[in-house]
Curated annotation (Swiss-Prot):
<dbReference type="InterPro" id="IPR008991">
    <property type="entry name" value="Translation_prot_SH3-like_sf"/>
</dbReference>
<dbReference type="GO" id="GO:0019843">
    <property type="term" value="F:rRNA binding"/>
</dbReference>
<dbReference type="InterPro" id="IPR014726">
    <property type="entry name" value="Ribosomal_uL2_dom3"/>
</dbReference>
<feature type="compositionally biased region" description="Basic and acidic residues">
    <location>
        <begin position="221"/>
        <end position="231"/>
    </location>
</feature>
<dbReference type="InterPro" id="IPR022669">
    <property type="entry name" value="Ribosomal_uL2_C"/>
</dbReference>
<dbReference type="GO" id="GO:0003735">
    <property type="term" value="F:structural constituent of ribosome"/>
</dbReference>
<feature type="region of interest" description="Disordered">
    <location>
        <begin position="199"/>
        <end position="240"/>
    </location>
</feature>
<comment type="subunit">
    <text>Part of the 50S ribosomal subunit. Forms a bridge to the 30S subunit in the 70S ribosome.</text>
</comment>
<dbReference type="GO" id="GO:0003723">
    <property type="term" value="F:RNA binding"/>
</dbReference>
<keyword id="KW-0687">Ribonucleoprotein</keyword>
<dbReference type="InterPro" id="IPR023672">
    <property type="entry name" value="Ribosomal_uL2_arc_euk"/>
</dbReference>
<dbReference type="Pfam" id="PF03947">
    <property type="entry name" value="Ribosomal_L2_C"/>
</dbReference>
<dbReference type="GO" id="GO:0022625">
    <property type="term" value="C:cytosolic large ribosomal subunit"/>
</dbReference>
<comment type="function">
    <text>One of the primary rRNA binding proteins. Required for association of the 30S and 50S subunits to form the 70S ribosome, for tRNA binding and peptide bond formation. It has been suggested to have peptidyltransferase activity; this is somewhat controversial. Makes several contacts with the 16S rRNA in the 70S ribosome.</text>
</comment>
<protein>
    <recommendedName>
        <fullName>Large ribosomal subunit protein uL2</fullName>
    </recommendedName>
</protein>
<keyword id="KW-0699">rRNA-binding</keyword>
<dbReference type="InterPro" id="IPR022671">
    <property type="entry name" value="Ribosomal_uL2_CS"/>
</dbReference>
Amino acid sequence: MGRRIQGQRRGRGTSTFRAPSHRYKAELSHKRTEDTDVLAGEVIDVEHDPARSAPVARVAFEDDDQRLVLASEGVGVGDTIEIGISATIEEGNTLPLAEIPEGVPVCNVESHPGDGGKFARAGGVNADLVTHERDATIVELPSGETKRLSPDCRATIGVVAGGGRTEKPFVKAGNKHHKMKARGTKWPRVRGVAMNAVDHPFGGGGRQHPGRPKSVSRDAAPGRKVGDIASKRTGRGGNE
């Protein structure tokens, strides 16, 4: 009898397949303020968060509240950032889209007013504020997609810190291992045809090939459910 395939092991939910969320710092969201207020805070530290690709800044606000915020490029220890409708247009400050001029790069953009920020949060990325309309603000996301958002949605001025992260090579497999482990991703990913016959339905043989049709029923047993699951068609094929 063969061993359990990786999909069956993943379903059991051991630590190998779970993200170490107990090490994550916090869910970063915009601080809530009154509409007429401008709240200032001093950056007292810049920290690493295993949950994300960008550094986070620990900010002590005037109301004696300390929280972690997504760090923008150019923001460092000792700098002051502002949150509010009347905040100045400077890197690291957070204010509604309606108060931000066109063409200014922004990050951590809210999808709906008050949700804390959903778009442009990865290291080194930013969204661009394209134009203002009467009842909407057009924002171009890092993917190139444009979004019509409420003018009351808040965003942070600038580019998320940590740019150039992907340009540095891992060099060693150990470095890649630690990176993937921090995200709960099983790595390395071994191909089924490279396994032994006992480990995978496509394993074994004198050369690497599935050895059977890859199409499999939707109702197949868990240990057999690999390949093209319930495929309507396979192969290259053209439009008919």
